């Protein structure tokens, strides 16, 4: 490979193998040997007398152009409600009157929040439209001026008395669930009814109860824990 390259460009073999930059694969460019004349390309050959294009023109920069992107209709300036024809839905949901007051949703906020702020001049719009007139410099408050900020015991105004009282909760009546009718009981057979009647008769028989009591008494007399048996033992031992 080196012999072929040296024969083409007239370089001796002592320079070593050509690197990638010499072959045109790297960042560098192959050096044109001085012995060889200017290279002519087929498309550069023209008639005699016409100016020949220089080979250096091939190394000039060039630009690639493409079509510009289409303009997007949706921008930050467009109104999406009118773009998607949602004006009717917007007016339907935003113009709906709410039955419940604002205090029901925000019970912990102090003050009368149900009434508009225009009545007592506490709205933020009033600060924007009519800002308070004040000096540029701030001066500390004196002791006489601080007396107006002291808290004094006294009755609360009527509008603040019911501030901490929560409205009574509505009692929801429990709905009684209607039970489904159970399956009808099977009719009693005559054998079952006779057996139940016999049990009732046995329980209600007074003679039977007396017999049970007598049996219990006899068992208690013959048992060693009976007090009569313990008292009879020393008498028998004394007779012996």
Curated annotation (Swiss-Prot):
One of the GO biological process terms: positive regulation of transcription by RNA polymerase II
Main location: nucleus
Pfam family, one: Med19
Region (Disordered): 1-29, 168-240
UniProt cross-references to InterPro entries, sorted A to Z: Mediator_Med19_met
Keywords, in A-Z order: Activator, Nucleus, Transcription, Transcription regulation
Annotated GO CC locations: mediator complex
Residue ranges, compositional bias (Basic residues): 168-180, 209-221
Subcellular location: Nucleus
Keyword Nucleus: yes
GO molecular function: transcription coregulator activity
Entry annotated with the keyword RNA-binding: no
Job description of the protein: Component of the Mediator complex, a coactivator involved in the regulated transcription of nearly all RNA polymerase II-dependent genes. Mediator functions as a bridge to convey information from gene-specific regulatory proteins to the basal RNA polymerase II transcription machinery. Mediator is recruited to promoters by direct interactions with regulatory proteins and serves as a scaffold for the assembly of a functional preinitiation complex with RNA polymerase II and the general transcription factors.
Stated family: Belongs to the Mediator complex subunit 19 family.
Subunit structure as annotated in this protein's UniProt entry: Component of the Mediator complex.
Protein name in the entry: Mediator of RNA polymerase II transcription subunit 19-B
